[in-house]
Amino acid sequence: FNEHVRKELEKIDENLDIDIYRDGLTIYTTIDSKIQGILEESFEKHIQKNQEILNKEFLADPGKLSRAIEGTNFDKDEVIEILSNNKDIPKELRDKFLVQGAIVAIDPQNGNILGMIGGRQEKEYLNLHGFNRATQAKRQPGSIFKPFIYMTALENGYTPTTQLLNQPLVIFIDDTTRWNPQNHDGSTGLLTTLRYGLKKSLNLISVRIVQELITPRQVVKKAKSFNLSTRIAPVNAIALGVSDVIPIEITSAYGVIANKGIYNEPISITHIEDQHGRVIKRFVSEQIEVIDESTNYIMLDMMKDVIDSGTGSKIRWKYKFNAPMAGKTGTTNNKTDAWFIGFTPQIVIGVWVGVDDPSISLGKRQFGSVAALPIFADAITDIYEWGSFNSGSKIIYLDNKENWAAPNGIVEVKICKETFDRAHDKWCKSTTEIYLENHIPSKNCQKHINAFTKYKE
């Protein structure tokens, strides 16, 4: 974090006509030391577990091991000795053998960076002036990109109960190339709602949204409005998150969803004082609405399901974190990148785990829910147990019952659990769904009314 602040200061010293190294300035940062410590503790605990899993993967696959040491001065026996005993990874091997990661914690209401980790923290790996993966790494996001797919569909008039077929499809890239996307577990199904598709991170539903409801270019436009600086390619595979993102930027984008659709640029400095104690510069993040509050609320509500009963539910049943929360798991093809980003009304935390060489798999079972989520879960649990944090000059008190309030324009409707049409009070098994007031379903459930009529006859 300190290195990130130094680089930020170097960007502004010429504009302020100051010398950050000689003028005796006092720099006030956004960091909360307690949150930073919690992030470091959770990161170190779980990154070592991920390292041990990767070591075993290499040991179980001699071909993978041989390919990874090509061009190095190490022979296979030397590397096997290192991995078998979980020894420190030598510098020459770290690009392919060392599990790395990044964490960013942000106050979504003002953009203050509360904590940051840009790589391994152990003494033998720590490089204070090196590559900060939180702010510099460009990695495939996988399924954590899917909220941009779904919110684009919501903005185009579709709803949480819009149904698409959870079946394989073939997409022709050109005359000779076909793409056959699959769900991560190879499963298929019948008509599936958008809410369920996001909750279970079904690739086939995400792909069909892009094929049948919206276009890749619409998704790119939406994602770029959240200030993602990397190139997002308008291709069919955008549905599965194939274009690189930077951890701090995608975490900040999730902060928009936590903050009623309003974007705050991440900031690391609150103000600067000269040697006489005079404030010479204050930093305030500009607030920009990038998605309508009501549409954002529906997106938020769908992402809460990910935590309550979807791919992120381990936070509930294993880690016993019960505060209102939303988020998304992410895993890339071949498990090269594992992500989890989660948020409450007060804080958003993004976690990325991977190897610097993006061709190296973390392991066959290293999904985002396995490799990244535990880092988040331990951190958020400890932060809420602590009960508060400092954000600029304010103390934010954490309430594990504080939830997001529905804005104007949101309507609750009883729908049939089977047909997803308006429920008949007496004959349908119903549930409550939320809609924008101008997209309320108009069709009544005919299946159960007709069945009742037939029964009477």
Where are these regions (language model features)?
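A penicillin-recognizing enzyme superfamily signal
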Residues: 29, 33-52, 56-107, 115-117, ...
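Active-site rim segments in enzyme catalytic domains, especially the processed small/beta chain
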Residues: 132-175, 309, 381
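Non-catalytic, structured segments within soluble enzyme domains
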Residues: 1-50, 57-64, 209-211, 221-225, ...
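Conserved catalytic neighborhood of penicillin-recognizing serine enzymes
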Residues: 158-219, 263, 275-305
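Proteins synthesized as precursors that undergo proteolytic processing into mature forms
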Residues: 124, 128, 139, 154, ...
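Sec-exported extracytoplasmic/periplasmic mature domains
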Residues: 6, 10, 14, 40, ...
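Mid-domain, small-residue-enriched loop/turn segments at the edges of structured enzyme/sensor domains
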Residues: 176-183, 213-252, 261, 266-268
